[in-house]
């Protein structure tokens, strides 16, 4: 019998550390909490050397024929101690093609929007910017691969440079260029102009989070269904999973019945309410 996966429980937490290879002062502490059950919303914070990344996200997914479209919906912020600047950015969406038949392919699409108000900086990175329409693809081929991305960096509304490259390869920043000036260059010419490598998948070492040795009692590792599953007792795991889900439904009904102007539900921030409405639509 097909069993449903374990879904996060409201209030469930997880703590871990991304360990730096050489300098422990550059370790990154990670904290995650499930802050909404319906729709599911996860809040997160990563504290590192002179920076703090934090935000929350809901999840959207829809099936279109032989493809799955999905992504995270919600803001992410990075605060820097050095100058007090904060970068806000959004996540791109994903296409997972070939879910039922054919070759399975994962692609980013749409865009990421970055803003930094202290220095009046912004950048909109577009994934697969030269994508052809279904009809257009019959008449001409696309000049850039599907993993290509491009974005103009602006300061005070004026373009000061371009980010361009492949999220499966190398991404460069070209100061003083525009999207038009760069797209008119041949690959050989791009090598000769001033540029800075800002991402190289061959150089990026995967980071693994080491779970906390002293987590909160609400840590995901203490869930009774997960403990039973790890021990190989599938029947007990399913029973405990159903108990947790039923308890969560009862508590949600109580919160809904007892909500008032003074309740937590009525005191949600405007951005959280917008996110909940977006995931429900």
What are these language model-derived features?
Residues 1-281:
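Extended acidic, Ser/Thr- and Pro-enriched interaction/regulatory segments
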